[in-house]
């Protein structure tokens, strides 16, 4: 068999082999291409026979070799495309979606229990004629402490472990700075000031079941003429009844806060045992709920308010504590862990 016949036979055999490769035969296709057209392939071996040909036959056979190479290269490229398309089609078929199957139900979101509690408390105060005022979470030491009758050398500063950013800038430890700023701007010729300031506050507490390094407070302030301790008690009684039910009672116990004088701790009659004593109230019949008092005259004077003419009261309560008492939650960390099993209980 002469060289021309061998070249023609190689072309035909290779083309027949290529057409038999269907589906995912990419490796076999590559191996075939190397065995035919590679540096040590069949076509290269045939080319070695050119040296034995006459001078007249060499250009003829050389041309035929190039034609065979071109035909086979084109055939390999086409077959590679076919094999690749077959792979893609097989993958699509294996991953096909049955459009008749029911879809996955998206979970509907709901307002967080702290958001619900905050909105309920704010609605109570709005109904009582209070205005709601927001303030800065990053605050000046001056407004957070000094304006609350806590100068830099005051021992009561040790009552609050503080996150300081600089010597004069900190994360607020209460929302009282909002009251100081509002008191500075209030025009008493238009009437008394009645405000609440809700928001996040920060303390350097170790997180456990009853403590958190961040929590939510809502603090109230009323300043006007002839404001008395009786006004404070009446306001607190109304708030507690709206939060915990009309049958609830309160009691005031003497306490100490630098920014109020006199100061009181406010207890509410236990809503589980009705005051008889149980595990919730630790057998006392009462549950501590908030702190309050008459605004210290020095706090008023620092805002330019005449403490001889005006007086006021202030109070502060924790929203997490209210929610924990109302819903029987025994671990404050549940509010912040993002566990849907916890959150879905309060839809």
From Swiss-Prot:
It catalyses: tRNA(Phe) + L-phenylalanine + ATP = L-phenylalanyl-tRNA(Phe) + AMP + diphosphate + H(+). Mg(2+) binds at residue 261. GO terms for cellular component: cytoplasm. PROSITE patterns: AA_TRNA_LIGASE_II. Binds 2 magnesium ions per tetramer. Its cofactor is Mg(2+). It holds the Pfam family Phe_tRNA-synt_N. Transmembrane segments: none annotated. GO terms for biological process: phenylalanyl-tRNA aminoacylation. Keywords: Aminoacyl-tRNA synthetase, ATP-binding, Cytoplasm, Ligase, Magnesium, Metal-binding, Nucleotide-binding, Protein biosynthesis. One of its GO terms (molecular function) is ATP binding. The keyword Metal-binding applies. Its EC number is 6.1.1.20. It is found in: Cytoplasm. Belongs to the class-II aminoacyl-tRNA synthetase family. Phe-tRNA synthetase alpha subunit type 1 subfamily. Tetramer of two alpha and two beta subunits. This is Phenylalanine--tRNA ligase alpha subunit. It comes from Streptococcus uberis (strain ATCC BAA-854 / 0140J). The lineage of its organism: Bacteria, Bacillati, Bacillota, Bacilli, Lactobacillales. The gene is pheS.
């Amino acid at each position: 068999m002469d060289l021309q016949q061998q070249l023609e036979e190689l072309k035909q055999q290779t083309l027949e082999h290529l057409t038999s490769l269907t589906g995912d035969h990419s490796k076999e296709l590559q191996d075939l291409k190397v065995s035919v057209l590679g540096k040590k392939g069949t076509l290269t071996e045939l080319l070695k026979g050119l040296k034995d040909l006459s001078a007249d036959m060499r250009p003829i056979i050389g041309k035929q070799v190039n034609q065979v190479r071109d035909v086979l290269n084109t055939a390999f490229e086409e077959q590679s495309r076919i094999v690749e398309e077959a792979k893609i089609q097989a993958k699509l078929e294996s991953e096909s979606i049955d459009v008749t199957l029911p879809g996955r139900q998206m979970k509907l979101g709901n307002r967080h229990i702290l958001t619900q509690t905050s909105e309920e408390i704010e609605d109570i105060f709005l109904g009582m004629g209070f205005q709601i005022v927001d303030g800065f979470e990053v605050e000046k030491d001056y407004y957070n402490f000094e304006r609350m009758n806590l100068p830099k050398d005051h021992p009561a500063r040790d009552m609050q472990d503080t996150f300081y950013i600089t010597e004069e800038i900190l994360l607020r430890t209460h929302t009282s700075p909002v009251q100081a700023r509002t008191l500075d701007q209030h025009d008493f010729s238009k009437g008394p000031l009645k405000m609440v300031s809700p928001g996040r506050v920060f303390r350097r507490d170790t997180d456990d079941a009853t403590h958190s390094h961040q929590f939510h407070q809502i603090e109230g302030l009323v300043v006007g003429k002839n404001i008395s301790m009786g006004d404070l008690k009446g306001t607190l009684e109304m708030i507690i009844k709206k939060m915990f039910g009309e049958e609830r009672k309160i009691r005031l116990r003497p306490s100490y806060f630098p920014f109020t004088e006199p100061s009181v701790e406010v207890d509410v009659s236990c809503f589980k045992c009705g005051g008889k004593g149980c595990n919730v109230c630790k057998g006392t019949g009462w549950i501590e709920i908030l702190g309050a008092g008459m605004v210290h005259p020095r706090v008023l004077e620092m805002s330019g308010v005449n403490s001889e003419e005006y007086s006021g009261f202030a109070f502060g309560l924790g929203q997490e504590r209210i929610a924990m008492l109302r819903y029987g939650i025994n671990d404050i960390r549940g509010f912040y862990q993002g566990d849907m099993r916890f959150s879905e209980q309060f839809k």
